[in-house]
């Protein structure tokens, strides 16, 4: 019986153990690979704040000196230029995304379906980082009506809510998703067909 107990202890210690891996909060890669992305400087700052021991291991002066000593002078210069290019490119992409997000308009439209039936169509939320399906579900619950995500002819997605709730949707978006979608980017678009019909 003592032999059986000994074999059990040995077999349990031979089983593979799970490893705890730290992932970067900026680029979502392990910190060892952050240098290959475009956000190396931000990744280093994040690691310094959140895991100082690993930061010391990866970015200490001795480690950097050891890594640089294996490179030739030309390779060092190339590595420095590449790192600068990657950082500049990442900064440019980030500013473009912010500009695009600031310029993106969310259009809320009232569309006539039948003689007295209307739907409200909301387009452009995905540009502000909102998930159309989740927002459609929230709208359906909020207004107790049918709400779905549909494809528009241009190939994008839009949310269709049954009923004429343009003003209410505008107020709700400002109240609930005001951080993601600034009020200046929300606009109610009038249906041009109705204006023509009213003019005649």
Curated annotation (Swiss-Prot):
Domain of life from the UniProt record: Eukaryota
Plastid listed as a keyword: no
Biological processes, Gene Ontology terms: formation of translation preinitiation complex; translation reinitiation
Recorded GO CC terms: cytoplasm; ribonucleoprotein complex; ribosome
Keywords in alphabetical order: Cytoplasm, Ribonucleoprotein, Ribosomal protein
Chief location bin: cytoplasm
Subcellular location(s) of the protein: Cytoplasm
Keyword hit for Cytoplasm: yes
Cross-referenced InterPro entries: DENR/SUI1_TIF, DENR_C, DENR_eukaryotes, DENR_N, SUI1, SUI1_dom_sf
Pfam families listed in its UniProt record: DENR_N, SUI1
GO MF annotation, one: mRNA binding
Domain SUI1 intervals: 106-177
Family note: Belongs to the DENR family.
Oligomeric and partner information: Interacts with the 40S ribosomal subunit.
Record note on domains: The SUI1 domain may be involved in RNA binding.
PANTHER family named in the record: DENSITY-REGULATED PROTEIN, DENSITY-REGULATED PROTEIN HOMOLOG
NCBIfam families, alphabetized: DRP1
Record's protein name: Translation machinery-associated protein 22
Organism for this UniProt entry: Coccidioides immitis (strain RS) (Valley fever fungus)
